[in-house]
Amino acid sequence: MSKIIGIDLGTTNSAVAVLEGGEPKIITNPDGGRTTPSVVSFKNGESQVGDVAKRQAITNPDTIISIKSHMGEAGYKVTADGKDYTPQEISAMILQYIKGYAEDYLGEKVEKAVITVPAYFNDAQRQATKDAGKIAGLEVERIINEPTAAALAYGLDKLDKDEKILVYDLGGGTFDVSILELGDGVFEVLSTNGDTHLGGDDFDNKIIDYLAAQFKADNGIDLKDDKLALQRLKDAAESAKKTLSSANEAQIDLPFIASGDQGPLHLQTSLSRAKFNELTADLIKKAEQPVLNALKDAGLSFSDIDEVILNGGSTRIPAVQESVKKLTGKEPNHSINPDEAVALGAAVQGGVITGDVKDVVLLDVTPLSLGIETMGGVFTKLIDRNTTIPTSKSQVFSTAADNQPAVDIHVLQGERSMAADNKTLGRFQLSDIPAAKRGVPQIEVTFDIDRNGIVSVSAKDLGTQKEQKITIQAAGGLSEEEIEQMMNDAKANEEADAKKKEAVDTRNEADQLIFSTEATLEEAGDKLSDDDKKATQEALEALKKAKEDAAAEDADLTDLKAKTEALAKAAQELAMKLYQQAAPKEGAEGEAKPKG
């Protein structure tokens, strides 16, 4: 069975790992990084992903960051380089880039992946993630929750231990808490909670707001109104936040950030860790309640927890670590790299699927309750949150009026009592119900949740056995046709990118050959006759002309390749002549003189 890679598709950064020799290993990107910025930029019809995209974020307005925070959002699109893109398409570009460098590392095609999502992602967000994988040309074998993946990475070498662990996962854009029980190779999620709109970006924004307010008070100019200045502020805020994880003060120096009546203005200030803690105190406080909720749902107290695992880059913030320690009464475990653990755990799950990892069983849960709208707009739950998945649950309902010919099934996800306060996953109708008094027809509604947390719902008239089924596709979700089209577009871009790379390689090869041949001719000097050098010189000039003719981006490179090949052959013959010309001389110098 081919390798299944594990991908942590993050808000700020992404990572990929693979199982080698029974151990998960991070695959580095072409820049040598162990994580890749989840950034996509567009320019002149071309897209770039990762570090190169992030580096131009300041100067290129068509740069997209933190797209994960919009996954599953109905109707959401971003416009870049004159074209609209869904979050699934942008995420697919990141996945395609990751897939590409994973293939380069493995030396084989990668077609399957385990992709992680925040534990508190709803059905629409999970489906959007799966669609992104499909667009990128990946068969998504499993969607698993990020804290669960981190627990797999932590517990792989502790299969003989019985532990209850709390995973505190604060990433770039999302926050999750999961409580798991580990024992005899079984990783059982007892509960999960979180906030899909709380993460490192929010900490950055607190610094941005503070710096912008300070600058406005001093100079009367709002830097947030200037896109370029705002991007510079964002970069400075992120850098300051990272500095304050290990230092008590961060210097912020942004020259020529704006222009005033007296000329250019500069932002030069410092930010202390104490001030940063003050600015972000409400965010850290906000993260406490999900921890308490998860503990309550698991039926445990803090004294029952054996280990507290920190995951996600934002857990490097000292105030976050201090808050976790104070709340749980335990020193957090730092044995796993918070930036890499999720990808490593996803690779372990990939190994479980292929059979390369034995004796590991993962039992995950659904993060939110599922049900339907019933009379009076009430939300009737069929599956409670924190139910182990996969699972199935049925309940019989009836009609609300006499001779009702059809029932509308309104599928919801959430914890509120009234349907209107919960998240709509989808709607469908069961029709042709025989005329009868209200309450007589028996309509059985069944919910199925698969291992990926994807929901299917069916409704059956028990009298006629007529049945209607849907796999939930939330508003704003993609149809199969749209996914197919996006897959074709992605493939076309992949082929176009490959052609561009081939063109660059061809031109580089020609350049290198011209340079090395000129050096060889110079070295030959008077050692060879003009006749000996003639063929090489002619081939050299021919290649130079072919290179000029093929300078246009869309030029046909056939002639350039042929002339490169011709010069390579001529240069080889020239080198051979040089070698032969030098050989007898070296032999003569090396001969021993007879004794006289």
Curated annotation (Swiss-Prot):
<comment type="similarity">
    <text>Belongs to the heat shock protein 70 family.</text>
</comment>
<dbReference type="InterPro" id="IPR018181">
    <property type="entry name" value="Heat_shock_70_CS"/>
</dbReference>
<comment type="function">
    <text>Acts as a chaperone.</text>
</comment>
<dbReference type="InterPro" id="IPR029047">
    <property type="entry name" value="HSP70_peptide-bd_sf"/>
</dbReference>
<keyword id="KW-0067">ATP-binding</keyword>
<keyword id="KW-0143">Chaperone</keyword>
<dbReference type="InterPro" id="IPR013126">
    <property type="entry name" value="Hsp_70_fam"/>
</dbReference>
<keyword id="KW-0597">Phosphoprotein</keyword>
<dbReference type="InterPro" id="IPR029048">
    <property type="entry name" value="HSP70_C_sf"/>
</dbReference>
<feature type="modified residue" description="Phosphothreonine; by autocatalysis">
    <location>
        <position position="174"/>
    </location>
</feature>
<dbReference type="InterPro" id="IPR043129">
    <property type="entry name" value="ATPase_NBD"/>
</dbReference>
<dbReference type="Pfam" id="PF00012">
    <property type="entry name" value="HSP70"/>
</dbReference>
<keyword id="KW-0547">Nucleotide-binding</keyword>
<dbReference type="GO" id="GO:0051082">
    <property type="term" value="F:unfolded protein binding"/>
</dbReference>
<dbReference type="GO" id="GO:0140662">
    <property type="term" value="F:ATP-dependent protein folding chaperone"/>
</dbReference>
<keyword id="KW-0346">Stress response</keyword>
<dbReference type="InterPro" id="IPR012725">
    <property type="entry name" value="Chaperone_DnaK"/>
</dbReference>
<protein>
    <recommendedName>
        <fullName>Chaperone protein DnaK</fullName>
    </recommendedName>
</protein>
<dbReference type="GO" id="GO:0005524">
    <property type="term" value="F:ATP binding"/>
</dbReference>
